[in-house]
Amino acid sequence: METLFRLPFAVLECPNIKLKRPGWVHMPSAMTVYALVVVSYFLITGGIIYDVIVEPPSVGSMTDEHGHQRPVAFLAYRVNGQYIMEGLASSFLFTMGGLGFIILDRSNAPNIPKLNRFLLLFIGFVSVLLSFFMARVFMRMKLPGYLMG
């Protein structure tokens, strides 16, 4: 294998180039990187790739017993399909739960006053629990009868 990789370099000669970093390029701050990670997590869990490829409608419609069309946000009985609003709502909940865990982690810093620590713990627990139970509600709307019993 080594010979196979050495073969092109026996024929070609590498140029003597000295590259240096441009002056305007600098290391991003930790908060900028964190914001990019959270935004990309939001978009990926929201199914942005699926939305670009399949181009589903933002919301669907369903005919009720009187023959009227009413909007629905969840594509029921289809695990591998979604409306755009369904993906964004689920993505918001996943992101809120993840941020709740990060808030819970930040509440353990040693220099935080007691009231702020309590508020961080409360907000963290509420966001984690709310996102968990709302995700269960979304699953019940997506697959009726799935989480029963």
Swiss-Prot record:
One Gene Ontology cellular component annotation held by this UniProt entry: oligosaccharyltransferase complex
Presence of keyword Membrane: yes
Pathway assignment: Protein modification; protein glycosylation
Keyword Aminoacyl-tRNA synthetase tagged: no
Bilayer topology term: Multi-pass membrane protein
Key words of the record: Membrane, Transmembrane, Transmembrane helix
Segments on the Cytoplasmic side according to the record's topology features: 1-32, 105-117
InterPro entries the UniProt entry points to: OligosaccharylTrfase_OST3/OST6, OSTC
TM annotation in the entry: 33-53, 84-104, 118-138
GO process terms (BP): protein glycosylation
Residue numbers on the Extracellular membrane side: 54-83, 139-149
Protein localization: Membrane
Functional description taken from the UniProt entry: Specific component of the STT3A-containing form of the oligosaccharyl transferase (OST) complex that catalyzes the initial transfer of a defined glycan (Glc(3)Man(9)GlcNAc(2) in eukaryotes) from the lipid carrier dolichol-pyrophosphate to an asparagine residue within an Asn-X-Ser/Thr consensus motif in nascent polypeptide chains, the first step in protein N-glycosylation. N-glycosylation occurs cotranslationally and the complex associates with the Sec61 complex at the channel-forming translocon complex that mediates protein translocation across the endoplasmic reticulum (ER).
Subunit-structure text: Specific component of the STT3A-containing form of the oligosaccharyltransferase (OST) complex.
Family listed: Belongs to the OSTC family.
Protein name as catalogued: Oligosaccharyltransferase complex subunit OSTC
Species of the source: Gallus gallus (Chicken)
Gene label: OSTC
